[in-house]
Amino acid sequence: MFKKDVSDKVPIYKLKTTEDVMKYYDVWGDKYDRDMVEWNYTGPQETVKIFKKYSKNKDIKILDAGCGTGLVGIELRKNGYTNIDGADLSKKLLDLIPSDLYKKLEQIDLNKTLDKKSNIYDAVLCVGTFTFGHVKPQALDELIRVIKNKGLICLTVNEGIYEEYGFDKKIKNLSNIKSWNVIEFFKSDYIKSKGVNAWLCLAEVKK
């Protein structure tokens, strides 16, 4: 699926710059959760379902990178995980998150170096963030940096940018240089009502 196939169905896919994305979320924020329900957006549920297969310890420290309004955090909480930090580019979306959902919330541009120490998280989940006009493949290096050895990273990549943005090469290279070991990799329904699929990847970090 290419950008021209989905941009009319999901308008934010037309955006190209970080500034445009932030402005769009400022307007869309109040309707975001409602639209996700109407669109049958299943990314958070699918990702947490896979994640919990490999992470039985519910006390681990997790980063929800690109947390939006907290949809992944809600799914994690439903499954017993409570030690969760959230980070997102949009202050508007962060302001909509229930105050008790995350331990810590930060406004962060994932395309830049993270102001975080290395090896501080047991796992990172990044859902709905690797998509048109949002976060680029090099952000994976920073996410891996903040994860402990043998920690997990679980992410989605919109299929429309998988090759166009170079995620196919990046994911393969991270395996080749032994930065991670990919455990699960498959195409998910993601936003089924819009005909938008995503690649879902779960990997163990190696250091």
Regions inferred by a protein language model and the residue ranges of each:
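N-terminal, positively charged/glycine-rich alpha-helical extensions of SAM-dependent methyltransferases
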Residues: M1-D30
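Conserved alpha-helix/loop element of class I SAM-dependent methyltransferases that forms part
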Residues: Y41-D59
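A short glycine-rich, Lys/Arg-flanked "PGG" loop and its adjoining helix->strand segment in the class I
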Residues: P137-N149
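Core SAM-dependent methyltransferase catalytic element
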Residues: I191-K207
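A short acidic, Gly/Pro-enriched loop at the edge of an enzyme's catalytic core
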Residues: L114-V124
